[in-house]
Amino acid sequence: MDILFAQIQADLRSNDALRQSSALLQALQQSAAGRDISVIAKSAVEEIVASPASAVCKKLAFDLIRSTRLTPDLWDTVCSGVKTDLHFPDPDVTAAAVSILAALPAFSLPKLISDCSSEIASCFDSPSDNLRFSITETLGCILARDDLVTLCENNVGLLDKVSNWWARIGQNMLDKSDAVSKVAFESVGRLFQEFDSKRMSRLAGDKLVDSENSLAIRSKWVSSMVDIVWRKRSALMARSLVLPVETFRATVFPLVFAVKAVASGSVEVIRQLSKASSAAAAANATVVDSNAEKLVGVSDLVTHLAPFLASSLDPALIFEVGINMLYLADVAGGKPEWASQSIIAILTLWDRQEFSSARESIVRAVVTNLHLLDLHMQVSLFRRLLLMVRNLRAESDRMHALACICRTALCVHLFARESARRGQKPLPGTDIISLFEDARIKDDLNSVTSKSLFREELVAMLVESCFQLSLPLPEQKNSGMESRVIGALAYGTGYGALNWTEPALEVVEVCRPCVKWDCDGRTYAVDCYLKLLVRLCHIYDTRGGVKRLKDGASQDQILNETRLQNLQRELVKDLQEVNTPRILGRLIWTIAEHIDLEGLDPLLADDPDDPLNIIIANIHKVLFNLDAAATTSNRLQDVQAVLLCAQRMGSRHARAGQLLTKELEEYRNHAAADTVSKHQTRLILQRIKYVSNLPERKWAGVSETRGDYPFSHHKLTVQFYEPSAAQDRKLEGLIHKAILELWRPKPTELTLFLTKGVDSTSIKVPPTAYPLTGSSDPCYIEAYHLADTNDGRVTLHLKIINLTELELNRVDIRVGLSGALYFMDGSPQAVRQLRNLVSQDPVQCSVTVGVSQFERCGFWVQVLYYPFRGARGEYDGDYIEEDPQIMKQKRGSKAELGEPVILRCQPYKIPLTELLLPHKISPVEFFRLWPSLPAVAEYTGTYMYEGSGFMATAAQQYGASPFLSGLKSLSSKPFHRVCSHIIRTVAGFQLCYAAKTWHGGFVGMMIFGASEVSRNMDLGDETTTMMCKFVVRASEASITKQIESDIQGWCDDLTDGGVEYMPEDEVKATAAEKLKISMERIALLKAAQPKKTSKIEEESENEEEEEGEEEDDDEEVKEKKEKEEGKDKEEKKKKEKEKGTFSKLTAEETEHMALQAAVLQEWHILCKDRKYTKVN
């Protein structure tokens, strides 16, 4: 291999173009085979890029550079070579040099563009088609990127040049050369796409913070290109028709985007964002006569595109045209025919099984635009789409498509019903039962076992969609795709609070067979189903039977309630066929809690098919089922649920009470019952007996239905890693994500600007920078980082200032990594070479890295600067100057760098919280998930807060209480605040937060706070120390391990240094000390209190003394006195009773008593701990 590499290097050094090109081809082959060719790349840079060579060799050398890593020194050489090539007389060599601009690293590109702007501009006027093509393609890639926009923001001269370059690219769309025209269309399309998605900037590794100016710059470019395309649309459409058919596809998107921007009016907002002065805006603005002209522009474009849907043979072109016509169908005045034409063409691709690589894209395109079709077409496509979705491989695409389909089903159902109510002819097949009538879907739902997860996804998605429909619909201010859907749903529900229950009722009927499924221990889909069923039973109050017309019930309500009652009867029969032990107890609870016991047929009392008998037989089955393993059933929970059902059913209905008493007596005396269950059963039996004796006091054993489903698919901590539990969690995550993306989408920044206009709150503030060097160091460096959660990347931005009075010719910045960070190109460290640093002139550079997992990580920066850099070494020797070999050596000889001065900087640590994302979750879901999380970390922290007496309590009505001051910064951290409970007497609280790591792990955090009462016991004094107990639970042990490895660091990340960590030993010691002091004080208080005695007692004492002195008193007198005392005592007791329940204790005394009780209780616990430690 060394011989081959030596041969290639020798060929590169020769001046023979043929040998050089074959050597470069060989090197490229070696690179493609995965070998390290950095040695050859160095030779190629020095011998070909930095020297005159043929266009072919230059192109091959640049391809070689792209396929390997170069050092910063070599990149410098490449840049100087490119500068010389831009002046080269052969346009092909210049074209090759221009093409490498897009591959230059972000730290060297801006300077090159600034230095060579005039040469770049002259390339547009070149007679060579190749050079015009190269410059249009390269600039189209670079100019839309974030880093270039930021460069223009800081350099007004460059901004004007780049704006002119965009205008030239726009003109090139009408260029005489087909290749140039096509690539100009692509470049303009890329600018439009980048405006919305920022995809290219992320690929370049620079996700910068959008400032107001950078947004204005990009908006200016976009609005000017939209104007160009709109003004010249007829010429551009004609030019695109003359292009070869295979390149026509590139022309579609720019035309469609610009025409839609003008027709929908969004170009006006883009102009406002660009902040152009009113005169300039007036000069550039397109004068549009009326809406009619806009509509004509749109229909012209549709007429131009439509023939390609029918006649084209290229699947990619049909797809592109179809997608863009759907985009146009959404414009005000767009026709459903445009949408139906496109969707039919796209579905034909599916039928022809062409374009199979884009199956997901085809389905996504169709399902997201279903609402543009008329009702007939939606219904006719429905079953077909359902089968298409079933066959999708990618989970996220399948979920999104399924969410769209479920929403469409609800839309169609509601819309058709409402239209029929308003007197229109009802359309057959629009109800949910008919839409899901397909034989294959029915078979899947009705079979007990199934290998695919699709049926579970379908049931869960339908149910979750119903719950979304029950929530208020999101407001839509702009017209667009979403507003049509929301309009249809609002029309269908008639803005009525309970109209969503009609389609939900049909969903519950369609999905009924799911309770019989055997899903290998998975329960998420069935839990979702039962949750919806419980909600509907609660809303329609099925416990109270079917309401009547004379009670004020409407016909629809009576019909719905009858259907629900019948469904309950069917489910009772299904109890015999339930195949998942976990589900049996839950289904019994769902039915028993809501069934109408009064409405049961008394004639069937002895019949085994009587619903009550079936329910009680299944309760018996759950109570006495000892064989089930802990993994398949949750016996503890099932028994609790069933006992609760028994109590409530027995209290509601006399016959049920009799039957259940027998069952419970048997269970109580059976070995299956543990001690707790026996006690509970005894209590339940007493309640049933009490209610049977006093029927008017049923409330003792029954409570109202709440509509809440108390079970969850989350299993115990021990079972967290079980496959079925993991699949359930994954399915839940996918479904929730798809539902939220569809029903409650987060608006993009652009959408926010288009709807709300320019609002400074939506523009991010750059983060604060931290100095990494000391104030006396010759180079000052400060740094800040930006995290891009989409791609899992972190960018470190450095600002370097030369604090010496000399100009530093060269400064190297080396960046190393620790923890989970890695460079995208796999190199061990990054080096940025900065040249000619003028004194006090700040220079910026950045490093982008990936993050592989949730772990503490940091950047380690080292500065090498060369204050003694000498001049170029002279070549001494008596050779002839003209010798080409000597000339080459002279050119290649490097200037002497001299000895570098090395400056090590402070490490830049990435806070752990930066690797988290807020996870929105409801309190109910949070508390159900909490016990199942296996990894736990607990620690105590303290902080001081200002305030005294009443001001320090949470009882303030207005203004923030000072006692949460130490946790203020939590609001800016990536945690979702699930709920908070504040104790409103002294400062005590419980806060719950939820987050997810970038890699999907769940982190839940609870903070319990208790204010420390100051030294003397009176509450009027200052209470300034807050003790916080932090409990963190996570789905993976590695997460809590990282937190526990440096708890103070984690506290600082969370609270910006507000909370100080207290080790457990200190906590126990301080608690013991405080308790000791408190006990002493209580003893002193008790000793100091004078005994309160009544007058009667004093009198009796006096009498006793007198008796001691005078022994000869009469016994009768004594008896009389005792009787009087007895009467007095009775009267006093009566008076106390008459006073009522008001205590004689004052507030302070009550507080003291409460404190004493708490102190004693804690004292006992500490004593127990001591005994335990002694024993151990």
Curated annotation (Swiss-Prot):
One of its GO terms (molecular function) is identical protein binding. It is found in: Cytoplasm, Cytoskeleton, Phragmoplast. Residues 1117-1149 have a biased composition (Basic and acidic residues). The keyword Cytoplasm applies. Expressed at the pollen tube exit site in germinating pollen. The modification Phosphoserine is found at S1100. Residues 1098-1116 have a biased composition (Acidic residues). Gene3D superfamilies: Leucine-rich Repeat Variant. Residues 1071-1156 form a coiled coil. Residues 1088-1149 are annotated as: Disordered. One of its GO terms (cellular component) is plasmodesma. Keywords: Calcium, Coiled coil, Cytoplasm, Cytoskeleton, Phosphoprotein. GO terms for biological process: cytokinesis by cell plate formation; endocytosis; pollen development. Transmembrane segments: none annotated. Disruption phenotype: Male sterility due to the production of shriveled pollen unable to germinate. The keyword Cytoplasm applies. Its main location: cytoplasm. InterPro entries: ARM-like, ARM-type_fold, TPLATE. Functions in vesicle-trafficking events required for site-specific cell wall modifications during pollen germination and for anchoring of the cell plate to the mother wall at the correct cortical position. Interacts with CLC2 and CHC2. Belongs to the TPLATE family. This is Protein TPLATE. It comes from Arabidopsis thaliana.
